[in-house]
Design a protein with these regions (language model features):
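Metal-dependent nuclease catalytic cores that hydrolyze phosphodiester bonds in DNA/RNA
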Residues: 1-120
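Mg2+/Mn2+-dependent nuclease catalytic core
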Residues: 110-222
């Protein structure tokens, strides 16, 4: 099912992202950190080295993630998208997922800011599920993050982006309080397999505050 004409959330004024450096700026000032930095704070040196090892090149996770995020963004907006055929096993399974059947798009690749914590972030999608007999604006609102994995077996092993979704949720609640998120989802996209992990927004929010506390303990005192 194609989405109807989207009623998108207005972007946050004066908030920008430099994609090359992955740094956010708000009202002309660079923000000190991103959600990804805070979440990545818990990684061991071995985990960081492993991520770096498989990041680069035409088949690295950075290229894969960018390509598949782009396809999903175009699908959510109801736009055609040209992509390399090598990503078809990922894309076919992803777009077959029932979550992306009948929905109304509220936002995708949406930039957020937490001014108090000098932090930026951006979520992948916010949709309202369309259900028979449910009036527009009364459907389940789903906040989602897309993760890609290299192998089919990795789909089952991938953990949900619980704290990350909690960060987006807390910023969204502050910036757009009328939006009531019913469910947070991590969509795990692998070749020929896709999995949606659904979580309660309150659990995500609690996981985020825990992650922030751990990160904050290591911040230098001024």
């Amino acid at each position: 099912g194609q989405p109807c004409k989207p009623q998108l959330l207005d972007p946050i004024p004066e908030l920008t992202l430099d994609h090359d450096s992955h740094r956010y700026s708000y009202k002309g000032q660079l923000l000190a950190r991103s959600v990804s930095e805070v979440i990545g704070h818990d990684l061991t040196p071995e985990q960081r080295a492993g991520m770096e090892r498989y990041k680069h090149g035409p088949d690295g996770w950075a290229a894969r993630g960018t390509a598949i995020h782009k396809v999903l963004e175009h699908h959510l907006k109801g736009e055609p998208c040209v992509m390399d055929d090598k990503w078809s096993p990922w894309v076919d399974a992803l777009l077959d997922e029932s979550l992306f059947g009948r929905f109304r798009l509220l936002a995708c690749e949406f930039l957020l800011v937490d001014e108090r914590r000098s932090m930026g972030g951006s979520f992948d999608f916010l949709i309202e599920l369309e259900e028979l007999g449910v009036p527009k604006g009364k459907g389940l609102i789903v906040l989602g993050d897309l993760k890609t994995v290299s192998h089919k077996t990795g789909v089952g092993r991938r953990k949900p982006a619980t704290a990350q979704l909690g960060a987006y949720l807390s910023m969204l609640n502050r910036l757009r309080p009328k939006v009531q998120v019913s469910q947070c989802v991590t969509v795990v996209s692998g070749p020929e397999r896709c999995k949606v992990i659904r979580e309660d927004p309150e659990d995500c929010h609690a996981a985020w505050e825990e992650a922030w506390s751990r990160y904050n303990l290591d911040l230098p005192e001024f």
